[in-house]
Regions:
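Histidine-dependent nucleotide/RNA phosphoesterase domain, centered on the 2H-phosphoesterase fold
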Residues: 1-170
């Protein structure tokens, strides 16, 4: 009997080709930008990952793309498959413009203690707010975008460090 639990999540093929190079991927994910110093430190962590286990990962993420994911509104590997939804989401976000602008320049302080496997597609740095006040601010902002499109999975603040090798254990 063959088991598939070591084969990884097949959804990785939406973002990573058979050659382990990133494919085009379209969407309107809501993200927080990171300071350059944070991106530099993350790049050091990623370097250690690739030195320690290069066979585990696909092409490296470029450090300037590191970000904190707040909400994945819509995404797909083919633009025409998601274009209408992107447009509809944009209209809904425009309707919430004033609410969003109230929080636009605020900084939400976060911490991290560990790296973990995110749905068997990637290795991520798990984040959490430093206190209850920051938690409330984060969840208020998340809830605002969740009214644009409700997600079917729990909110997990994170920074993606590396995507797994698409062909591992194939």
């Amino acid at each position: 009997m063959e088991t598939n639990f070591l084969r990884g999540n097949p959804s990785i093929s939406q973002k990573v080709g058979k050659d382990n190079v990133f494919r085009n991927f379209y969407g309107d994910t809501i993200v927080f930008a990171l300071d350059d110093i944070v991106k530099e430190k993350l790049a050091e962590y990623v370097e250690l990952l690739y030195q320690s286990a290069p066979e585990c990962f696909c092409e490296r993420l470029v450090p300037h793309t590191f970000h904190v994911t707040l909400h994945d509104l819509s995404n797909a590997p083919v633009l025409r498959d998601v274009a209408e939804e992107l447009f509809e989401n944009e209209l809904k976000v425009i309707e919430k413009r004033e609410e969003i602008q109230k929080q636009e320049n605020e900084i939400i302080k976060m911490k991290s203690k560990y790296i973990f496997n995110m749905v068997d597609t990637s290795l991520v740095l798990r984040l959490y707010p430093v206190d209850e006040g920051e938690y409330r601010r984060l969840m208020d902002l998340y809830s605002l975008f969740d009214t644009v499109k409700k997600l079917s999975y729990p909110f997990t603040p994170h920074i993606t460090l590396a995507h797994y090798d698409r062909n591992r254990n194939a």
